[in-house]
Amino acid sequence: MPASAKDAPSWVLDPVHTRVMFAVSHAGFSQALGTVSGSTGTLVFDPDDWARTRLDATVPLERVDLGDPSWNRAALAQRLLDTQAHPLARFTSESAIPTDDGQASVCGELTLRGGTRPLCMDVTVNAVKRHPMPPFRRTAGFSATAVLSRSHFGIVAWPSVIGDEVTIRIEAEAVRSRLAEPEPEQEQEPGALQ
C-alpha cells in the first residue's frame, strides 16, 4: 500500500446500503434504468486528506435488475454482459483529487466483461459519523456519478436499440473496519426504554 494511504482510516463497503444504478438509451425513446445490489470492497479514506484515498470495489453483475425478467436475461447473456464468463465488475482507484468541499474526482481502472479501462467518478461525501442504530458503527456515506462507453468494454450488440453511453450513479455506505475502530460506548436502541 502506498505510504500516503498507510495510516488513513480503513473502511468496508456495506453491501446492503450500497447500490449501483445505470441508465442507457432505449432506442432513443427513453432511458432504460437498472440497478445492481450487493457490491463489496475495501476503502481507505480520510475526509481531511483525499490524496490518501484507495478504493477496491467489486460489483456482482448477476444481480443486475432492469425490472423485467426478460430484460434481465438479455443483459446477462453472452452478447451483452456475459456474466457466465465475467460475473464480476471491479473498480480500483489510483487517484483522488479534491474539486470542492466534500467532493473529489476519483480515478482508477474499471474491469468489465474482461476488459480494463480508465474511469473517473465525481464523488460527494454525504456524512461521516457514528450510525444512530446498533451496533453504532462509524459510517461514511457517498454519492458518485460516472459515464462510460459500453463499446470500450466490448459490449457492442444491438447498437440501434441500446445506446453506447451509460450513465452510472452510485449510493454507497462504508463502515470502519472492526480492527481499526474501538468499541463504541453502549447506547440504548430507540424505544428500548418504553
Task: Give residue ranges: language-model regions.
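Low-complexity, acidic/polar, glycine-enriched regions of mature
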Residues: M1-Q194
